[in-house]
From Swiss-Prot:
<keyword id="KW-0812">Transmembrane</keyword>
<feature type="region of interest" description="Disordered">
    <location>
        <begin position="1"/>
        <end position="25"/>
    </location>
</feature>
<dbReference type="InterPro" id="IPR016186">
    <property type="entry name" value="C-type_lectin-like/link_sf"/>
</dbReference>
<protein>
    <recommendedName>
        <fullName>NKG2-F type II integral membrane protein</fullName>
    </recommendedName>
</protein>
<keyword id="KW-0675">Receptor</keyword>
<dbReference type="GO" id="GO:0004888">
    <property type="term" value="F:transmembrane signaling receptor activity"/>
</dbReference>
<feature type="transmembrane region" description="Helical; Signal-anchor for type II membrane protein">
    <location>
        <begin position="75"/>
        <end position="95"/>
    </location>
</feature>
<keyword id="KW-0472">Membrane</keyword>
<dbReference type="InterPro" id="IPR050919">
    <property type="entry name" value="NKG2/CD94_NK_receptors"/>
</dbReference>
<feature type="topological domain" description="Extracellular">
    <location>
        <begin position="96"/>
        <end position="158"/>
    </location>
</feature>
<feature type="compositionally biased region" description="Polar residues">
    <location>
        <begin position="1"/>
        <end position="12"/>
    </location>
</feature>
<dbReference type="InterPro" id="IPR016187">
    <property type="entry name" value="CTDL_fold"/>
</dbReference>
<feature type="topological domain" description="Cytoplasmic">
    <location>
        <begin position="1"/>
        <end position="74"/>
    </location>
</feature>
<dbReference type="GO" id="GO:0009897">
    <property type="term" value="C:external side of plasma membrane"/>
</dbReference>
<keyword id="KW-1133">Transmembrane helix</keyword>
<comment type="function">
    <text>May play a role as a receptor for the recognition of MHC class I HLA-E molecules by NK cells.</text>
</comment>
<keyword id="KW-0735">Signal-anchor</keyword>
């Protein structure tokens, strides 16, 4: 294991910077300046390669989360995405449902207005000078084919 030694130095101004004069020995020059403090810290550094030998499950970087926290973060992220998708889907679909309901309402009003023309049988709808019957009854195929023939009408399936 290689050990390396390093020194960290920091120079900062003192809390109460007062002007002071210093006379150098042997010179007649005076130096005016602010009071400064110097901090030195000695650091012992080890080779990073020696730390990585052996146990790969240790975490040497601060940015990596241990597995339980990482798993929790992933689950919460997925839940957040699902909730956002649900909210967006709701925002988009609610106006569409409202438009469909309005269209259905206006279609029902037109059908009610069309019924009051007079020349079509009761429960029939007049549209473009023709009469139409929209049935909701359940009938067999033979009954559906014979029913319009008996009334001298044409059958149309949509």
């Amino acid at each position: 294991m290689n050990k390396q030694r390093g020194t960290y130095s920091e120079v900062s101004l003192a809390q109460d910077p007062k002007r002071q004069q210093r006379k150098l020995k042997g010179n007649k020059i005076s130096i005016s300046g602010t009071k400064q403090e110097i901090f030195q810290v000695e650091l012992n550094l080890q080779n990073a390669s020696s730390d990585h030998q052996g146990n790969d499950k240790t975490y040497h970087c601060k940015g990596l989360l241990p597995p339980p926290e990482k798993l929790t973060a992933e689950v919460l992220g997925i839940i957040c995405i699902v909730l956002m998708a649900t909210v967006l889907k709701t925002i988009v679909l609610i106006p569409c449902i409202g438009v469909l309901e309005q269209n259905n309402f206006s279609l029902n009003r037109r059908m009610q207005k069309a019924r009051h023309c007079g020349h079509c049988p009761e429960e029939w709808i007049t549209y473009s000078n023709s009469c139409y019957y929209i049935g909701k009854e359940r009938r067999t195929w033979e009954e559906r084919v014979c029913w319009p023939v008996l009334r001298r009408t044409l059958i149309c399936f949509l």
